[in-house]
């Protein structure tokens, strides 16, 4: 046995062991919100309702904080896969991971496009299914309270809370179960790692994936949707699709004078920048102020990218609650 094959065998055995531990943990969950109440793959699409309001939630680095370090765990998992399964050295693995993410929105899409893998579901097993999420995430009761209130009149009275993720369903559902919020969502739009390699693989920020989420949730008009994501490309795509309120979650964002930036976009859309998902109640009702230098910079950057921007700038004080 060569050294390379020996390392690969050790790597695969470690993956198998961790997946077994992950499955045992998932099956042991009994806390509030650890079970889903929706059908993951319903047999038919719901009828669109013109009055329906839907809030779309990204999962990774959104429903849990980036500072949990799950992203670093994912990056290490990706790096190991590129090294031990695909045979790249550390530098080349790092370069390809970043390059594919920037160009395609997901590293796996780059691997598919460049014919470097032939089994996407196996890739998912090595990457997301093997993550020891239970060592990094725990039930978030404040987040649970927020989600419950979003369906109440005082916080927008959304008809549906919808998971919208570039991950496969296994990882997505495991995350929300551990967080204790699985029972609060009405459905999920996820990337189909389980489809044949020759089929088109779509993910955010592809507009077709947004249309898929619209159909699956029964949303009639994007104007009736709210969307939150930590990825700038996904946020820009949501704005271009006409979503009613788009939130860019930037955990290390520096508010100017402790103000949250909320701005009116074209076609009565609104765009907000938040540091924490728990700040959502603060942008439900906003008062108009003069634009901050940060807001102006954001507008200029969007205009340079070709966005048709017609803002009236709004901010609210973080301490107002």
Curated annotation (Swiss-Prot):
Under which name does UniProt file this protein? Phosphate metabolism protein 8
TM ranges are none
Q: What is the organism of origin for this protein? A: Saccharomyces cerevisiae (strain ATCC 204508 / S288c) (Baker's yeast)
Q: Name one GO cellular component term.
A: cytoplasm
Q: Name one GO biological process term.
A: triglyceride homeostasis
Family in the record? Belongs to the SSM1 family.
Against InterPro entries, the record matches this protein to: HAD-like_sf, HAD-SF_hydro_IA, HAD_sf, Pyr-5-nucltdase, SSM1_domain
Q: Name one Pfam family in it.
A: Hydrolase
Gene name, per UniProt, is PHM8
Which SUPFAM superfamilies would you find in this protein's record?
HAD-like (SSF56784)
In its UniProt record, a GO molecular function of this protein is: nucleotidase activity
Function per UniProt: May be involved in phosphate metabolism.
Gene3D superfamilies with a match to the protein in the record = 1.10.150.450, HAD superfamily/HAD-like
Query: What upregulates or represses it?
Result: By low phosphate level.
Instruction: Name the domain of life.
Output: Eukaryota
Q: What else is known?
A: Present with 195 molecules/cell in log phase SD medium.
What PANTHER family does UniProt report for this protein, alphabetically?
A: PHOSPHATE METABOLISM PROTEIN 8-RELATED
């Amino acid at each position: 046995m060569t050294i390379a094959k020996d390392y690969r065998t050790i790597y695969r055995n470690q993956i198998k062991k961790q997946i077994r531990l992950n499955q045992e943990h998932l099956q042991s969950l009994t806390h509030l919100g650890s079970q889903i109440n929706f059908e993951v793959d319903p047999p038919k699409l719901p009828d669109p309702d013109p009055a329906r309001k839907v809030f779309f939630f990204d999962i990774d680095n959104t429903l849990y904080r980036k500072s949990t370090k799950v992203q670093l765990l994912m990056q290490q998992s990706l790096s190991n896969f590129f090294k031990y399964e695909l045979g790249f050295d550390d530098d080349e693995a790092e370069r390809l991971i970043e390059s594919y993410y920037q160009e395609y929105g997901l590293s796996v899409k780059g691997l598919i496009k460049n014919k470097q893998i032939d089994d996407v579901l196996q890739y998912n097993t090595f990457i997301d299914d093997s993550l020891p999420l239970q060592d990094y995430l725990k039930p978030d009761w404040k987040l649970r309270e927020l989600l419950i209130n979003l369906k109440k009149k005082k916080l927008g009275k959304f008809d549906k809370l919808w998971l919208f993720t570039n991950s496969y369903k296994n990882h997505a559902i495991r995350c929300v179960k551990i967080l204790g919020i699985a029972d609060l969502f009405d459905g999920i739009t996820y990337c189909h790692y389980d489809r044949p390699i020759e089929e088109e693989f779509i993910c955010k920020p592809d507009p077709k994936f947004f249309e898929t989420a619209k159909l699956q949730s029964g949303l009639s008009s994007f104007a009736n949707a709210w969307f939150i994501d930590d990825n700038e490309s996904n946020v820009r795509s949501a704005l271009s699709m006409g979503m009613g309120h788009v939130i860019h979650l930037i955990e290390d964002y520096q508010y100017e004078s402790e103000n949250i930036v909320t701005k009116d976009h074209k076609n009565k859309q609104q765009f907000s920048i938040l540091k924490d998902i728990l700040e959502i109640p603060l942008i439900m009702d906003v008062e108009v102020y003069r634009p901050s230098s940060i807001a102006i910079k954001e507008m200029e950057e969007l205009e340079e990218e070709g966005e048709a921007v017609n803002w009236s700038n709004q901010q609210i004080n973080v301490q107002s609650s």
